[in-house]
Amino acid sequence: MRLRTWALAMLLGAPSCSGLIASAQYSAPATPAPYNPIALAEVTGAPRTAVQAGQNNYQTLSQNPYLGGVPSGKLSAAPVELSLEDAVTFGLKQNLGGVLATDAVIDARGEKWQALSSLLPNVVTDTGFGVHQVNVKASFGLSIPNEPPIIGPFGYFDSRAYLTQSVFDWTSIERVRSSQAQLKSAEFSSKDARELVVLVIVSNYLLAIADQSEAESAASQRDTAKALFQQASDQKAAGVASAVDVLRSQVQLQSREQKLISAENNLAKQKLVLARAIGLPLGQQFEMTTQILYQELTPSSLDDAIQSACQARADFQSQTNRVRSAELAKKAAFAERYPSLGAEADYGLSGVTPGSSHGTVDAAATLRIPIFQGGKVHGDVLRADASLTEERQRLEDLRAKIEQEVRDAYLDLEADAQEVTVEKSAVILATQTLEQSRDRFSSGVTDNIEVVQAQDALAIANDAYIASLYNYNVAKISLARATGVAESRYAAYLRGN
């Protein structure tokens, strides 16, 4: 059985198209796509087994923004209750990946205003006052009869407002439209980041629940091993069991105690991962209050899901706007060949002193006609065309990727549902086997080798059942992500609606 470890290694891998915005000057944070670091993991215990193997990529994990958060709030001495809905709410506000995506939208909005400034009026003012003295002969080589060679000192005052306005510049117009498409792309990327945040938070919450179930199962197995050890000791004292039976049961007890310690440690560490991803104060203790029971999900038809996925997926809409932005950028490059018309004007007061100043005005219009620019326009067009081709190819690749993710999610959902049924039956059979083995040992029919083997089989069956439940619930939320409804319908999918 494959074991997917979405919780800790959810977002490793190459950046997807959804987190990027096409611009030579601007690039939003990459939105990594979820991937499974352990493609084929044998069931040897629980979800934690594969996760520990995935922690070999710890450095990559620690650099992933979706696994970090911006801590907020005050530390409480008492443990706080944390439901799944609370965790998602905190994550949407404080997860680092979501916060960076929001900042990218602000950055794109600033770039749009920068492009728009070339079309809007520019007004500046300038005020100056000075005192001058001129040597006429030294400056101009003139001698004026009956006049001193030095004129002045005299004052000069000028206060003026300057206006520049682009009347027609098709290149700037297309660049503004391109930046508007970039802004829309950034906004859709931010929405896609929220989808990924929900995917990460829910998956980590599910893994924490699985670890908690593992710890409870390990505690139950420890109690059973303790009872078996006491039973073997009593039977040895009664002369029914041998010393090796006591030693065997004692070794089994210590093994179960060790597993309980490991399970509790894994649970504590997974809680730290979850707390960091949702931005809880460092060191804040919490208790998970949402219990995710087995609820079978019956999704819509595969064809309907594939058709609706592209329309619902924010990363697809983001990439569509990137293509639009690249198209407009190419038009802007072509428009560099077109003439442009601008206007300039100024009005102000000039005089010897502010009190004796008079109003003056200047106005001019400028027509610029490009004739030869050394091949710059041709180069800009080639680069813009290459960028457009790249974005179109990325869009088609993303379309195929979305369909693959939907198909994968449907396959996982069906397979994991079957595995839950099989593993639940295995737990029932293993429990019956342990009960019969204990009865046989109590009756003196056999030694406790059968009991130890049956207890090990039950432990493996319990762990596999916990893993199958975790995988099935992750398959649900993965389907919600693949169809673009993770934020709006994650709770309904987990409930089987």
Residue ranges with predicted function:
Residues T60-F90:
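Regulatory alphaC helix of protein kinase catalytic domains
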Residues A9-G19:
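Bacterial N-terminal signal peptides
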Residues V80-S83, N122-A193, L302-D304, S308, ...:
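Small/polar-residue-enriched beta-strand and adjacent coil segments characteristic
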Residues L100-A115, A193, V197-A218, A227-F229, ...:
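Amphipathic alpha-helical coiled-coil segments
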Residues R2-A7, L20-V51, Q133, L282, ...:
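Acidic, low-complexity, intrinsically disordered peripheral segments
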Residues V88-L92, N146-E147, A241, D245-Q252, ...:
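Amphipathic alpha-helical coiled-coil scaffold segments and their short linker/junction regions
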Residues R194-S308, D412, D416, A457-L458:
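Periplasmic alpha-helical coiled-coil/stalk elements that build and connect Gram-negative outer-membrane
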Residues S83, D107, Y156-D158, S203, ...:
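Transmembrane beta-barrel architecture of outer-membrane proteins
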